[in-house]
Amino acid sequence: SANPPFLKPKSWRLDRIGPDSSVSVKDRDVELDGGFLLTLADSVRGNATVTVEHDGHVVAEETKPVELLAYNEWGGTGFMPELLAAFSMPNDPAIDRLLHDASLILRAAGKPDGIDGYHSKSRQRVWEIASAIYAAVCNLGISYAVPPTSFERDGQKIRLPGQILENRVSTCLDTTMLFSAALEQAGLNPVVALPRGHAVAGVWLQPEELSTIVIDDAETLRKRIQLEELILIETTFVTSHPAPPFSKAVATATESITPERDDTFHAAVDIRRARSHRIFPLCRKSETPSAKDETPSIPVAELP
């Protein structure tokens, strides 16, 4: 049993436990109550209890404390950092709006307006799509919010795409996950890198992925960047008005993982690799601003 009821009740029937002996329970499939967890707006402390009964009498009981995070809260790199991939939400309705704006920006720049992922087999085309997404986010007029101290280690609540588009405020991790979702929905493979006190987005320029979901060395990223297989993007630049060009966002993000900063690099999470390990996006829809509230996008992309 659990209090609050974040677990669905589960019972096992054991025919016999001999004196001074033990029995291993093989069926340990305890089901979480997703509906309850989805209602948590803030983290709460709870407990899970295992009770042993015989003939209706309790003969043993053990209770363990559990911390329940809010539905939109990531626990940090200290525990299962790969779960950050769940906050890349490509199917959030807000992402389609961003990709629509990115398509218009491509068209205005005289480029093909299809958001076609790796279909063209061109690294230059991936750069163009990523640059157009950057421009579309710049046009939102987002304001910067200071993240919690040591968020990359201890975690934080993450604003979902619809919340960002509605309220126009975000931390570096919020905008990074927004970019990740847009890149993923565009058919590209995103990466999230976590230097100390910061978060930046990345995208593979060809259909690649890291060998594991999470890496803790920046050298792997640097090698792929040098091979022109991967770029990183400083997503907080979208909160500057006017925003720096896309090439500057790429250069600045790359500087955040220089060898001199290796001792402060926390992790990088490969979103596509996480999906192949069944870490899927959060199942939560958000409202996007209605069309009458939207302002026309102004192409500010840097598209060679």
Please place each PLM-identified region on the residue numbering.
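A structural boundary/capping signal
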Residues: S1-P304
